Amino acid sequence: MRNFIRLHGSRVVRPALLAVSAVAAIAIVGGTAGTAAGYGTAPVHHDHNASRLRTEAAFDDPQLAHGELAIEGTNAGDRLALRLQSGNPAILQVDVGDDGSADFRFARAEIAKISVNGGNGDDAVRIDESNGVFTDTISTTVGGGNGDDNLVGGAGAVTLEGGNGDDILAGGSGVETLLGGNGSDSIDGNGGNDVALMGNGNDTFVWDPGDGSDVLEGQNGTDTMLFNGAGGPEQVDLSANGSRLRFFRAQGNITMDTAGVERVDFNALGGADLVTVNDLSGTDVGNVNIDLAGTLGGSNGDGAADRVVVNGTNGDDTIRVDGDAGAAKVSGLAATVNVLHPEAANDRLEINTLAGKDTVNAGGLAAGVIKLFANGVPLP
């Protein structure tokens, strides 16, 4: 995932700044596997609950019972990281405050499941697998609860639940389930073939080069898929699959299977790109924005010969092409297609009307915006 990704000029999805409010005790569970400096080993209890050595923790003590490690947040903005102990992958550390120090330690072999509930407040919780992967063998669910939460997944089958609030969910490299909940959420699946249920609100799902083929359910609200291209030539195709949108990128053999997504933003970036928008009737997509700028957030083209192809239907179509120096718009079909930052010297917009008695009206397109073709014939 990029450090910063522009979302409609205002919002960003970024790696979480993560750490759960306050300092808790260091405890050993499931044996005497190491101690914190200045402390003795904690007693081992049959219910595997961690012993508390200090009392000033805002995050409730993690509880390990019957193989489930349960971590409950507070009504404040909590910060938490989970990681394996460096040099000793048999120990799972709970870092309250995400300050790099372990506040609780548990024998990894005793854990079959992890559940984190951030509670109220704007929480930041992340899976830190820099010392090794553990979510591939331990089922892990991280819930933000109420508040604007920042949740980061891992390399295994992690479930991230935003809950209420405008949340940021960032998956890891694994095959994850990302649940936005209520609020306007920003969701980035990152690696792996993820499933995102974006929930209520006006949500945005972000895809970057290197990510997997994902399933998106926009659900309620006006939702956006933001797909960032790479610096080289790409071939992208948008088509209807029943009531679902199939967004295919040839490079990497990426297929995005979406429903309930009303807007698609594609940042083509560098290279001679080909973007084909087929008839999207039956889907929820009403707007497709294709940005031909050479950089994210830029206003200048990439200097390459880009092609945008818009295919009509087999019925009688009335298509309009409008625009000025900054953009061209194709309307009259199921989805309005906006071509942003075209270069008249390099880029071309092709309209294929297919069967039926069709009309293409380009009277609203200013000169010098983009090369326009209708059924292979250049239009002045």
Task: Give the role of each language-model region.
Residues R2-G38:
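Secretory targeting and sorting signals
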